[in-house]
Amino acid sequence: MLNQKIQNPNPDELMIEVDLCYELDPYELKLDEMIEAEPEPEMIEGLPASDALTPADRYLELFEHVQSAKIFPDSKTFPDCAPKMDPLDILIRYRKVRRHRDFDLRKFVENHFWLPEVYSSEYVSDPQNSLKEHIDQLWPVLTREPQDHIPWSSLLALPQSYIVPGGRFSETYYWDSYFTMLGLAESGREDLLKCMADNFAWMIENYGHIPNGNRTYYLSRSQPPVFALMVELFEEDGVRGARRYLDHLKMEYAFWMDGAESLIPNQAYRHVVRMPDGSLLNRYWDDRDTPRDESWLEDVETAKHSGRPPNEVYRDLRAGAASGWDYSSRWLRDTGRLASIRTTQFIPIDLNAFLFKLESAIANISALKGEKETEALFRQKASARRDAVKRYLWDDENGIYRDYDWRREQLALFSAAAIVPLYVGMANHEQADRLANAVRSRLLTPGGILASEYETGEQWDKPNGWAPLQWMAIQGFKMYGDDLLGDEIARSWLKTVNQFYLEQHKLIEKYHIADGVPREGGGGEYPLQDGFGWTNGVVRRLIGLYGEP
């Protein structure tokens, strides 16, 4: 990837100097609360909270040895293994035998750990099924039932059934689940919607936020905050009344705004940045600054080539994972080098749009419950965020939303994340019209809309298209009256997925859509995954709206 040619169709937007020299960071507010920042889970009746230690914390040098030795092709495999005995006993045994001449690390791991189950090998698709039938038959395959928690496993037990994306992802994921839920609702699976609603509310109650996924190594970060959108979906589909989730929405908001009151202009703490004019906007963050358990070796290698303190790089890699866009030119100072990642220095347009939706949802539900003061407070917060986004993230010259580099005080790259303000109703009609023109000319292809217009070798860039981006673009443009563009994206995406399904009899995580011939999407840290939860969800919903392609 480092030698790959970067195609930049808009050089004016890429005037970013490569700066790999480390400087002391006066902008980050250091508070005592950052020590041991991860919340301790509570006990609830009927389901004991899971042990929150990560595999890296628990197995120490054994964990590093296994990951460094590449015993498994995928770095996620070992963190997902479950020990056959007390981890302390395993560690003691390892320390006793590791220096023996005939020590075999692979055999040691096989003797002391249960490997993760591989579910995908159990399912064979029927080529005679239509796309709709295929998706409806996949829901049981992607469903995981609540189970007694395996002692010392990284999997966090949940009280109800849930849907997983598929492939290597054998746990539920926060923002993936919203787009999966769209399809569940269309398939009439209100039972699963109720289960997943209960699970996410349970995680907020017990961990103070919804983690990236239900693994111990995901507890230190969240993902794009879409619980307010889930609550809206629950209300629309008669699954649960929105009022019952008001406290959960407030708790999630407190997580994202933690430390805001202590900040002065040009200072940041965790997820919050106070801008030069005193307004508050948010960034992605992870409370840990170590290599990710699930991508340990990849992170170590990336940090080696960064020219920066490793812990700083690890934090930015983790924050990039929290964004859901792992990885993309959006987070890179030099779009050809993952080692130049600076996620925590960008104010993302999509994150702040989702938080606008959260603030608006709290205000709306508070109004339904007659809580006038709370309603007024959160309407003011939503209005202030909308104004700040317009000041800092709206590029009036080009008619687009862009991320904002708050450390350099300049706009960053244009990507499909720019459509999220339309999806949540934050843009005005003039902004929506101008953005539609930019999307038509810069991101739209015969196969759907591209994640970005930059070819970097990262998976959230050109030539890839992703289901959640299609859905938000379709609905966002239609909400502002541009049915023509919304319908074009919808039919293009349905054609892409159906054409690939007819040839390969499967749905996948992402698609190569740059040239009108649907192919498997590439890039990223891991092989392409089949399944696939949010692709199934979005396509099933679109079939309900547009019919089978």
From Swiss-Prot:
Enzyme nomenclature, EC number: 3.2.1.28
Residues binding substrate, per UniProt: 168, 175-176, 212, 221-223, 292-294, 324, 525
InterPro entries: 6-hairpin_glycosidase_sf, 6hp_glycosidase-like_sf, Cyt_trehalase, Glyco_hydro_37, Glyco_hydro_37_CS
Annotated keywords: Cytoplasm, Glycosidase, Hydrolase
Pathway: Glycan degradation; trehalose degradation; D-glucose from alpha,alpha-trehalose: step 1/1
Domain of life: Bacteria
GO cellular component: cytoplasm
Residue stretches spanning the membrane: none
GO process annotations (BP): cellular hyperosmotic response; trehalose catabolic process
Tagged with keyword Cytoplasm: yes
Major location category of this protein: cytoplasm
Active site (record annotation): 326, 509
Broad EC category: hydrolase
Compartment annotation: Cytoplasm
Any one Pfam family match given in the protein's UniProt record, by short name: Trehalase
PANTHER family in UniProt: CYTOPLASMIC TREHALASE (PTHR23403:SF8), TREHALASE (PTHR23403)
Quaternary structure (record): Monomer.
Free-text function comment from the UniProt entry: Hydrolyzes trehalose to glucose. Could be involved, in cells returning to low osmolarity conditions, in the utilization of the accumulated cytoplasmic trehalose, which was synthesized in response to high osmolarity.
Similarity comment: Belongs to the glycosyl hydrolase 37 family.
Protein name, UniProt field: Cytoplasmic trehalase
Provenance organism: Shigella boydii serotype 4 (strain Sb227)
Gene this chain is encoded by: treF
